[in-house]
C-alpha cells in the first residue's frame, strides 16, 4: 500500500500558496478592484480554493504612503502655506548632536545659519527691486521660497552687485515637493502673455550683468511652459545682448524636445536641480520627478549645445538624511553627463508639513565637499550652509568664465575671417 507521505508532499506547495495568499490579504496595501464587486461570494471562494494557486491572477497593487505629505496637502486652497510661528519654529528646529550613545537634542539654530532680517527701509536697492517687481507683476523665487540670502542678494552695494532670481509662469506650481514652500495647485492661473516683455524691461532697467530665470513646474501645459521660457530669454537678449542669462528649469516631465527649445533660446547657463541623492528622491521630490530623469535633462543640454557651448549646473541640499556614499555616487553620476557646476546648501524646513531636518551640516563639512567636487573635475562649486542654487557667489566666477569663452570665440572668429579674406585676396591677385 502506498505511503501517505508522498501525498502530503504533493499537497505542500498548494498549502504554501494558500497561506501566502492569506498573508498578503491581511497587509494594509491599497488595491485596485478587479471588477465591479470587491467582495467574493462563498461559491467563488470555494472554487478559488480548489483552483491551482499559480493560475490565480493577483489584483494590481499600489502602495499608499501615509508617512509623507501628499500632493493634496500642498494644494493652496486646502492647506495653509503660512510660515511657522516663532514658537513652532523653535520646537521644530532640533538636531541630534554628539557621538553615538551620547547624543543630545539641541533646539537652537547653529550660529552659522543665522542671518539678519532684510529691511526695505534700511537698503534703497532692496526697496527699488521690490517696487519694480510689484509694478510689473513679476515674482521671484527669492520671496516664494523664503531664501535666507534675499537681503544679501537684493541689497548689493550697486546695481551690478545686486541679484534677483525671477520666477516665470506665475507663483503657483503643479507639483508638491516636500522641501519647497512655493504654492501648489492642479490648475494654476493661465500664463501672462506680457510676462516675457515685462521681465526683459525690468532687467534692462536694473542694469545687471548676470540674471537667473527660474519657473514653477507647469504640468498642466502641453509644452510645460518651455516656449514661454524661451521667448522670455529671447526678449531679454534683444533688449540687452551683453546680459548673461542663467535658466533654472524643471524637467518638463522628461520631454527632451522641450528641453531643446529652452537650450537653443540663447541662454548662457542651463541649470536643473537634482535636489538630493537618488535614494531620497522619491521622498523629497514630487513623485513625477526622478533622479535619472533629471540626469537626462542635463545630458541632453550638452548634446544640443555641445560640451563647450554651454555651462550646465545643478544643486544638492544636504541634511535630509543622505549618506556619504550616496553623495559620492550622485557626484559621479553628474560628472558622467558633464555637469560643470554644482552647489551644496543646508536644507531648512519651511513649514510643518515639509520634511524635517535630519542633520545640520557644519561649515567645515561643506568646505570638505567643495574640495571633493573640485577634485572630481567640476568647473566650480559653491558650498555652504546658506548657499542656494542661484547664490550670487557662484555667478561672479561663472560670469568671468562665460566672458572669457565669449572673448576666445570672438578672437577665433576674427582670425577665421582674416584668413579667409587673405586667401580671397591671394586668389584674386593670381
UniProtKB/Swiss-Prot annotation:
Compartmental location: Mitochondrion
One Gene Ontology term of the molecular function aspect: lipoate synthase activity
Substrates-to-products reaction catalysed: [[Fe-S] cluster scaffold protein carrying a second [4Fe-4S](2+) cluster] + N(6)-octanoyl-L-lysyl-[protein] + 2 oxidized [2Fe-2S]-[ferredoxin] + 2 S-adenosyl-L-methionine + 4 H(+) = [[Fe-S] cluster scaffold protein] + N(6)-[(R)-dihydrolipoyl]-L-lysyl-[protein] + 4 Fe(3+) + 2 hydrogen sulfide + 2 5'-deoxyadenosine + 2 L-methionine + 2 reduced [2Fe-2S]-[ferredoxin]
Keywords noted in UniProt: 4Fe-4S, Iron, Iron-sulfur, Metal-binding, Mitochondrion, S-adenosyl-L-methionine, Transferase, Transit peptide
UniProt keyword RNA-binding, yes or no: no
Pfam family, one: LIAS_N
Organelle targeting peptide span: 1-29
SUPFAM superfamilies with a match to the protein in the record: Radical SAM enzymes
One example of a Gene Ontology biological process annotation: lipoate biosynthetic process
E.C. numbers: 2.8.1.8
Cofactors named for this entry: [4Fe-4S] cluster
Cofactor note text: Binds 2 [4Fe-4S] clusters per subunit. One cluster is coordinated with 3 cysteines and an exchangeable S-adenosyl-L-methionine.
Record's compositionally biased regions (Low complexity): 28-58
Matching PROSITE patterns: RADICAL_SAM (PS51918)
The Radical SAM core domain, residue ranges: 156-379
A GO cellular component entry from the record: mitochondrion
Domain of life: Eukaryota
List of residues binding [4Fe-4S] cluster 1: 142, 147, 153, 390
Gene3D superfamilies documented for this protein: Aldolase class I
HAMAP family, per the entry: Lipoyl_synth
Family: Belongs to the radical SAM superfamily. Lipoyl synthase family.
PANTHER family noted in UniProt: LIPOYL SYNTHASE, LIPOYL SYNTHASE, MITOCHONDRIAL
NCBIfam families, alphabetized: lipA (TIGR00510), PRK05481.1 (NF004019), PRK12928.1 (NF009544)
Protein name, per record: Lipoyl synthase, mitochondrial
Origin species: Neurospora crassa (strain ATCC 24698 / 74-OR23-1A / CBS 708.71 / DSM 1257 / FGSC 987)
Amino acid at each position: 500500500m502506498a505511503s501517505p507521505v508522498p501525498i502530503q508532499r504533493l499537497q505542500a506547495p498548494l498549502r504554501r500558496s494558500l497561506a501566502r495568499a492569506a498573508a498578503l490579504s491581511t497587509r494594509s496595501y491599497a488595491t485596485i478592484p478587479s471588477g465591479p464587486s470587491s467582495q467574493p461570494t462563498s461559491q467563488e471562494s470555494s472554487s478559488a480554493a480548489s483552483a491551482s494557486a499559480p493560475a490565480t491572477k493577483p489584483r494590481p497593487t499600489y502602495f499608499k504612503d501615509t508617512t509623507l505629505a501628499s500632493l493634496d496637502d500642498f494644494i493652496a486652497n486646502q492647506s495653509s502655506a503660512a510660515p511657522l510661528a516663532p514658537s513652532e519654529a523653535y520646537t521644530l528646529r532640533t538636531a541630534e548632536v554628539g557621538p553615538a550613545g551620547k547624543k543630545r537634542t539641541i533646539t537652537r539654530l547653529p550660529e552659522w545659519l543665522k542671518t539678519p532680517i532684510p529691511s526695505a527701509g534700511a537698503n534703497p536697492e532692496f526697496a527699488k527691486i521690490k517696487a519694480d517687481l510689484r509694478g510689473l507683476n513679476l515674482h521671484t523665487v527669492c520671496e516664494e521660497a523664503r531664501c535666507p540670502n534675499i537681503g544679501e542678494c537684493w541689497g548689493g552695494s550697486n546695481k551690478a552687485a545686486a541679484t534677483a532670481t525671477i520666477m516665470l509662469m506665475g507663483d503657483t506650481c503643479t507639483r508638491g515637493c516636500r522641501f519647497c514652500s512655493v504654492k501648489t495647485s492642479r490648475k494654476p492661473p493661465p500664463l501672462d502673455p506680457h510676462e516675457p516683455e515685462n521681465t526683459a524691461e525690468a532687467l534692462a532697467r536694473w542694469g545687471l550683468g548676470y540674471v537667473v530665470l527660474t519657473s514653477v513646474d507647469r504640468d498642466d501645459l502641453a509644452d510645460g511652459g518651455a516656449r514661454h521660457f524661451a521667448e522670455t530669454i529671447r526678449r531679454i537678449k534683444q533688449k540687452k545682448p551683453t546680459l548673461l542669462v542663467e535658466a533654472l528649469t524643471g524637467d518638463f516631465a522628461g520631454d527632451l524636445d522641450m528641453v531643446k527649445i529652452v537650450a537653443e533660446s540663447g541662454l548662457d547657463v542651463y541649470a536643473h536641480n537634482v535636489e538630493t541623492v537618488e535614494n531620497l528622491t522619491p521622498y523629497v521630490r514630487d513623485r513625477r520627478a526622478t533622479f535619472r530623469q533629471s540626469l537626462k535633462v542635463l545630458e541632453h543640454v550638452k548634446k544640443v549645445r555641445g560640451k563647450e557651448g554651454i555651462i550646465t549646473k545643478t544643486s544638492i541640499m544636504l541634511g535630509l538624511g543622505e549618506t556619504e556614499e550616496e553623495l559620492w555616487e550622485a557626484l559621479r553620476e553628474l560628472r558622467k553627463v558633464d555637469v560643470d557646476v554644482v552647489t551644496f546648501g543646508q536644507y531648512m524646513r519651511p513649514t510643518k508639513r515639509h520634511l524635517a531636518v535630519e542633520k545640520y551640516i557644519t561649515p567645515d563639512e561643506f568646505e570638505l565637499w567643495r574640495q571633493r567636487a573640485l577634485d572630481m573635475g567640476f568647473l566650480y562649486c559653491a558650498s555652504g550652509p546658506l548657499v542656494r542654487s542661484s547664490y550670487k557667489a557662484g555667478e561672479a566666477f561663472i560670469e568671468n568664465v562665460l566672458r572669457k569663452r565669449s572673448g576666445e570665440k570672438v578672437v577665433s572668429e576674427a582670425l577665421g575671417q582674416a584668413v579667409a579674406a587673405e586667401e580671397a585676396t591671394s586668389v584674386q591677385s593670381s
